[in-house]
Regions:
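ER/Golgi luminal nucleotide-sugar-dependent glycosyltransferases, focusing on the catalytic module
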Residues: 1-119, 126-331
Length: 331
């Protein structure tokens, strides 16, 4: 089974990017998440992402590195495992430029040469210990995932966009039929206590938001075609949103669709994955990286991080302690 990785990245210090952003919005606005510095800034840790892939997941077939034509100066673009992808290579021109990561994600299946089985990474998701293909895909080729509900009553932009996804899911799928058909997948003992809410709301007639581990996500490329066939008007409308919006859809639509189509195998992703909001858990993030407690970690940025420079120095030292050697992706 060929498995590819896809990662999106932006360098907000690039003069051309700044010019394009200024034309679309004007200036960075840290009072609004969708326009904030944390949405676009680079930690300088990208080399550790590549080192982690090479050391902990050397089996990957190809890395599709998606940018708006940017690349770090240290990146060896001649590496045969690397495919540089410009937004213009796979996103319709009428939706570009975009500063909305969800638009980049709607069209991932159109990346030239992408394998049917792929794993999508944001640039704050890192591999920190040996990770086999079976972490992402079962032997039968289906993605490993966790199908459990969570309450989503939040007022944040992110919470609202997740509810937009669920409205579409309920339009196309019958919850009671899906849970009956795939009982063993939805009520797998693999999930442990994470499935408590699913059990509690079993009789409720509508889908809720599915729990999001917020880390590297395995997909079937064919899932994207299926969602586009069913939801083209909604996805095309959402693609016009140059910046994040309350009326957005998100990649969780594709993931939830995949689950509702029974195109997954149960796996409790929380057992080896952890998200660390750096605003409140910077020390825990550093400790987890140094001790390699998880296969995957997310270091989630915020403009409200106290002692930002010190936090970044500590994180870099932690990554350097487990990934000190240059990868073949570095010049």
């Amino acid at each position: 089974m060929d498995i590819d990785f896809v990662i999106t990245w932006v360098d907000m210090n690039d003069p051309e990017w700044k010019k394009s952003f200024a034309k679309a919005k004007g200036t960075i606005d840290n009072s609004q998440n969708q326009y904030s510095e944390a949405r676009f800034r680079d930690y300088g840790f990208l080399k550790y992402w590549f080192r982690g892939v090479e050391k902990f997941a050397p089996w990957v077939r190809k890395i599709h590195f998606v940018t708006c034509g940017q690349k770090p100066e240290w990146l060896d673009t001649s590496n045969p495992k690397l495919n540089l992808v410009n937004h213009t290579d796979y996103i319709p021109e009428k939706y570009l430029p975009t500063f909305n990561s969800t638009v980049l994600e709607f069209y991932l299946d159109r990346i030239p040469g992408l394998a049917e089985h792929f794993v999508y990474f944001n640039d704050d998701f890192y591999l920190t210990s040996p990770t086999g293909p079976d972490r992402f895909f079962a032997p039968n080729g289906l993605p490993h995932d966790i199908a459990v509900f969570r309450m989503n009553t939040g007022l944040s932009l992110w919470s609202k966009t997740l509810r937009n996804n669920v409205r579409l899911i309920n339009k196309h799928f019958d919850k009671k039929e899906i849970l009956k058909r795939d009982h063993d997948k939805w009520f797998s003992p693999e999930y442990g206590s994470k499935a408590n809410l699913t059990r509690l709301l079993r009789a409720y007639g509508k889908f809720l938001t599915i729990r999001i581990p917020h880390n590297a996500q395995p997909y079937l490329k064919s899932t994207f075609a299926s969602v586009w066939d069913a939801c083209r008007p909604e996805l095309e409308e959402a693609s016009t949103h140059t910046f994040r919006s309350e009326t957005d859809l998100t990649p969780e639509l594709f993931r939830t669709w995949q689950i509702c189509k029974s195109d997954f195998e149960p796996y409790n992703t929380y057992k080896d994955t952890k998200m660390f909001p750096l605003m409140v858990k910077p020390k825990q993030a550093v400790k987890a990286i140094r001790e390699q407690k998880y296969k995957l970690v997310c270091i989630n940025d915020s403009v409200h991080i106290r002692n930002y420079e010190q936090v970044m120095q500590n994180l870099e030292a932690a990554f350097q302690s487990i990934l000190p050697d240059k990868s073949s992706f570095e010049l």
